[in-house]
Amino acid sequence: MTEPLKPRIDFDGPLDVDQNPEFRAQQTFDENQAQNFAPATLDEAPEEEGQVEAVMDAALRPKRSLWRKMVMGGLALFGASVVGQGVQWTMNAWQTQDWVALGGCAAGALIIGAGVGSVVTEWRRLWRLRQRAHERDEARDLLHSHGTGKGRAFCEKLAQQAGIDQSHPALQRWYASIHETQNDREVVSLYAHLVQPVLDAQARREISRSAAESTLMIAVSPLALVDMAFIAWRNLRLINRIATLYGIELGYYSRLRLFKLVLLNIAFAGASELVREVGMDWMSQDLAARLSTRAAQGIGAGLLTARLGIKAMELCRPLPWLDDDKPRLGDFRRQLIGQVKETLQKGKTPSEK
């Protein structure tokens, strides 16, 4: 039995196509290019908070220089000489029964003791301010840790430093929410969402009140010198209150150091953040056409005070910012504008009557 022949099939192109892969030309590096070679880096947005923390840590860390060591050595030698001479004078006055000289030695000892005590106290407060940056780094590590056993002790230490009583409702809710199966990241996150907002709310109220006072003072005061003195005094007082709120006791040098860090933080962040948060909305509302020049200056001074308070809050806070809990200038701007408008309306109402 024979099968019928199949019809012929014609193909337009050849069945086997010669595939010649294209290779890139060989590239070689000479000795000069090999020494200057550097791998390409991806264009990633720099993390502003990490950079600010690095700058803050570098500013807080004392610079170990040769001149500093020489000065410290000279002061130590001078102090030892003063103590030795004082002991010798005291012994001579006791042996010769020179009670006047003995009283002078006692007074000098009291003065020296008070000075040493003040130096030790200032150093301890400055050390406490430096430790806050390390605690913030430790909290950041715990928020990325899957271990157990360290988070609860760390949070209890923070609550004790802030002066939060064990019977506080927020702390009691945190104790009721944690259990042994949770890792350090979960424990610290619960503390950041249950206990830390209590202190943050108080700091926000302090910032809002100081910014409002600065705004109204500038808006109604006709003297620029008085305005500058008032703003400086209010800003220093705001920094002291925020530091005390977060459990940091400031001395003279630690207060100057914190104020310097706040200004450094503001300068490092640059004016882009201020323009981004305020500029567009400021122009859209056409405040220059609605408010007087003094009122606009008052709002600017209030925003500067608010920004100063936000940065002080960021430096004194023991935990890094999570999610969107960081306060923004826009939150205070709307309140300042409303207060200025209300004040101007109250001022116009009696004059119209």
From Swiss-Prot:
The entry's keywords: Cell inner membrane, Cell membrane, Membrane, Transmembrane, Transmembrane helix
Topological type in the membrane: Multi-pass membrane protein
Main localization category: membrane
Gene Ontology cellular component list: plasma membrane
Cysteines paired by S-S bonds: none
InterPro entries: DUF697 (IPR021147), UPF0283 (IPR006507)
Transmembrane segments: 70-90, 100-120, 213-233
Location of this chain's protein in the cell: Cell inner membrane
Family designation: Belongs to the UPF0283 family.
Protein name (Swiss-Prot/TrEMBL): UPF0283 membrane protein YcjF
Gene this protein is translated from: ycjF
